[in-house]
A protein has these predicted regions:
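Structural motif corresponding to the intra-repeat A-B loop/turn of tetratricopeptide repeats
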Residues: 19-20, 54, 94, 128, ...
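TPR-repeat structural position
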Residues: 22-23, 57, 97, 131, ...
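TPR alpha-solenoid repeat register
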Residues: 43, 76-78, 83, 117, ...
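Residue-level recognition of tetratricopeptide repeat
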Residues: 14-15, 49, 89, 123, ...
Length: 228
């Protein structure tokens, strides 16, 4: 309450988050700002992210929607796509796939969020079995961020799903030239080629590290690739 402006309340909250302060809670500062200006975009977005990290996705969604309501009062396509992107994730984590899809598309209007948004769009299209659309979307993501390694894995998966195994192997090889530790692409190369040497190389590099396997498994799950 001693801080005079909403701007400084927001910046103080950001500072506390960045430096992981042991005794001060950034949420207190965002809440104070919102008690003065309930529609503040940045503080609502920040609050939503904090609730997301706690797994409180419905609470997060409410804050993102409030931020978007303010952002779109005069302009249906806001200058900042982050609240829409975060809304997409909060909806996705609640199983609201269609709402998530729409939110990610709105976020993609903003250039800064195109690679991340089109990647999430491609994941949802893959879940729906819309592989051609998903391939178009993942290409848009890679156009904005050529070294998006998760997008590269997804493209390999889609090419293989569409029976373009040779193209999948070639793209996996190109991706491994960029990052030889892209285990998603390495695994996709094995699935597309059927060569056991690819699988053995992956196992060698993974060093039986269970957490690594879990992380890469989650990447496949996020695109509905449970079988893989």
């Amino acid at each position: 309450k001693e801080i005079a402006s909403i701007e400084q309340l927001f910046l103080t909250g950001v500072h506390l988050e960045q430096y992981r302060h042991a005794t001060y809670n950034p949420m207190d500062y965002y809440e104070e700002a919102l008690s003065r200006e309930p529609g503040d975009v940045r503080c609502n977005n920040a609050m939503g992210l904090l609730w997301m990290r706690k797994g409180e996705f419905a609470k997060a969604e409410a804050h993102f929607r409030t931020a978007i309501k303010t952002l779109t009062q005069r302009n249906p396509n806001p200058y900042d796509g982050e609240p829409y992107f975060n809304l997409g994730w909060s909806c996705r984590m609640q199983g609201k796939i269609d709402e998530a899809y729409d939110a990610f598309y709105k976020a993609a209007w903003n250039a800064a969020w195109q690679d991340a948004s089109y990647f999430e769009i491609a994941r949802i299209e893959t879940i729906r079995g819309e592989y051609e659309k998903a391939l178009e979307s993942v290409e848009k993501s890679l156009t904005r961020n050529w070294h998006h390694h998760k997008a590269r894995q997804l493209k390999c998966s889609l090419l293989r799903k569409m029976k373009y195994n040779e193209k999948a192997v070639a793209f996996a090889d190109a991706s491994l030239e960029i990052d030889s530790f892209n285990m998603g692409c390495r695994y996709e190369r094995y699935l597309a080629s059927g060569e056991n040497s690819d699988l053995e190389k992956l196992k060698e590099l993974m060093r039986d590290w269970s957490h690594g396997y879990i992380e890469y498994a989650l990447d496949f799950v996020a695109g509905g690739l449970y079988e893989e």
